[in-house]
Design a protein with these regions (language model features):
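Short, well-structured N-terminal submotif of metal-dependent ribonuclease cores
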Residues: 1-40, 54-61, 122, 128, ...
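Hydrophobic side chains within alpha-helical segments
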Residues: 10-12, 16, 51, 96-102
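Active-site-proximal, substrate-binding regions of enzyme catalytic domains
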Residues: 26, 44-48, 52-82
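Short, structured coil segments at secondary-structure junctions
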Residues: 71, 123-124
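Active-site neighborhoods of divalent-metal-dependent phosphate/nucleic-acid chemistry enzymes
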Residues: 74-117
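Short acidic-hydrophobic, aromatic-tinged amphipathic segments that line or gate anion-handling sites
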Residues: 76-78, 127-130
Length: 143
């Protein structure tokens, strides 16, 4: 089973039904729900997601959505090493650097899924948009 790290932008697309991106993100979460892939999210994403999602709903509704998300995915820790690696990196976006190092430190992550691939140009992990991941996954599954 492939382990995929899901960036917060993809999760926001899914949870807010943000068009035109929500279709691909919903398919990825369907694959996770069907246990065809394993989804991973950093612990940092939860606070970022709460902040963004709170603009769309009540505290209670957002917490409920995040609880459901926590049941679907593995939550990867952000610790001292993660932050120090991010601070020492050449990433232009600090939040993305923390996401990247959280994914990289989890040795079983096979790829990172984001719509923001330009910020991960120096990644040692494969970085794909949701659309590219789905095409790759379908091609691999059918062969």
């Amino acid at each position: 089973m492939e382990n995929v790290f899901i960036d917060a932008d993809v999760i926001v697309d899914f949870l807010t039904d943000r068009k035109p991106f929500s279709l691909e993100s919903a398919k990825i979460f369907s694959l996770i729900d069907q246990k065809k892939i394993k989804g991973c999210v950093s612990s940092l994403s939860f606070s970022n997601l709460y902040y963004v999602l709170r603009k769309f709903g009540t505290h209670k509704k957002v917490i409920s959505s995040l609880q459901e998300l926590s049941e679907l995915v593995d939550i990867l820790k952000v610790d001292n090493d993660t932050v120090k690696s991010a601070l020492a990196s050449d990433f232009k976006d600090f939040e993305d650097s923390i996401q990247y190092f959280a994914a990289q430190e989890h040795k079983k992550v096979d790829c990172l899924i984001t719509r923001n691939i330009k910020d991960y140009k120096d990644s040692s992990l494969p970085v794909m948009t949701p659309e590219t991941f789905l095409v790759t996954f379908e091609n691999t599954a059918s062969s």
